[in-house]
Amino acid sequence: SPVDTSHKEISIVENNGQGMAPYMMSVGLYVACMAFTLMYPLFNDIEKAESGFKYWLSKASIWFAVLAVAAILMIGSLMIFCNLNPQQLLMTFIFAVIVGCALIALVTLLSILCGKIGEFILLVFMVINLGGSAGTYPLETSSTIYQIIHPFMPFTYSVNGFRKVLSMPNVSLNYEIMIFVGIIVVCSLLTVLIYNHRIKKPTLLIPQAFE
C-alpha cells in the first residue's frame, strides 16, 4: 500500500450506556435540584434574619451539602449498579459535586426570584438544555437554533466535562470547572441581593400570575 495509516484512540467508551452517561448525569443533577427547591423552604423566618448574606449562608450551607451528597451517591450508584468505570475517578466525583452546586445555585436563584413562575421557567430551561447541549448526537446534526444556543447552556459544559472524566484519562477540566465556579459565584451574589430585598420588603420582585 502506498499509504500507511495508524489508529489512535483519544477516548475509551466501553458501551452505549457510558456514552449516554454524561447527558443523563447532567439531567439527574438538574432534576435533583428542582425537586429539592420544591420541598425545601427558601424563605421561612426571613423576617428574623439579620442580613441577606447570613440568611443565604444558613440556606446555602444546606442546599450545597445536599447536592454534594446527591452527586456522590449518583456516581457511586452508577459504579456499583451500572459498572461505570471512569478514567479519572477522583475528578469524576469532584466535577459532579461542582456541577451539582452550580445547578442548585442557579435553580434556587430562579425560584426565589420568580416564585411559581420560576419553577415553570426552570422546566422550560431544562428542555432547552436537553436540545442545546449536544448530549446525544453531534452538534452538527442539530438545527441551527441549537447550534446558536449551545455555548450558553450549562449542560453543554457538564456533558463535556463528564465525557472527559469518564472516557479520557489525561484531559484537563479547567475550563469547565471555571464555568461552573463562575455560575456559583454569580448566582450566589444575586441570591444574597434578593434576600436583602426580601428582608426589607417581603414581596417577590416579579408579580405572581398564579396567586
Predicted regions and their residues:
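Membrane-spanning alpha-helical segments of multipass transporters and channels
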Residues: 4-211
